[in-house]
Amino acid sequence: MQENNLNNFGLTVFDLKKLKGKRKIKFVQIDTLDQGLAAKESGIEMIGTSYEQSKAHFPQKLKGVHFQFGLRWGNQASTEEALRESMKAMNDGAQSIYCPMSPSVVEVLSKEEIPVIAHVGLIPPKITLTGGYRAVGKSFDEAKMVWETAKRYESAGAFAIELEVVPGKLASEITKRTSLFTISLGSGSKCDAQYLFSADILGEKNDFLPRHAKRYKTLFKEHDKIHNERINAYKEFINDVDNNLFEDKKYSVSMDDEVLNKLINFIDKK
């Protein structure tokens, strides 16, 4: 890895491939730029988020990390749409693209040299096919399906694959037996990267925490405090309005009575 890569781009796809099997990469999903800035400052090496125009500036603000934009499943209904969106995301600064579409779509993106991260295991938009929110790959048939799907993505040209809620032993074999850079989300610690969502790490919400996630902080408590402070501030404003506080010279502009009377006389003559 070249020094300028670390300073300007963070880990490139080239670097990630070279690091496979050598050390574990720390990867987080973010929802906000504030989360991304904190992740970068903490030493997180790989950051991802869904590709939306409101987030198109994130890579420029987060230079020095490997930045991945993700295509939301269902937003692109054809290979052409996925290709166009991926190219836009790369132009906006992404170094890799998460694509949960089929190997045939991934193959087209890969032929255009778009570095693709595929997805196997528990895929939230497709859970009806695997029986809901549960581990995928514990039985022989399911493990075989996960393995064969991973191999199809490898053949299609994906450079990496997210393994979500797949048995750790199965994820380990996929890591050892394929060229894919593997990313574990609830799939043990033997993959090439360990992945969690920032909302879970930070405790942004006081709601369901997936079994595979770990909450390190409870920021929702601080959010509640801030929310209550906002309510109190608005209530104080309402009270001040009701009590005509804004007539005070501190909050309004004064005018000489002579000038006012002159204006009134002018208006009355019209």
Language-model features, listed with the residues they occupy:
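Alpha/beta enzyme core
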Residues: 1-270
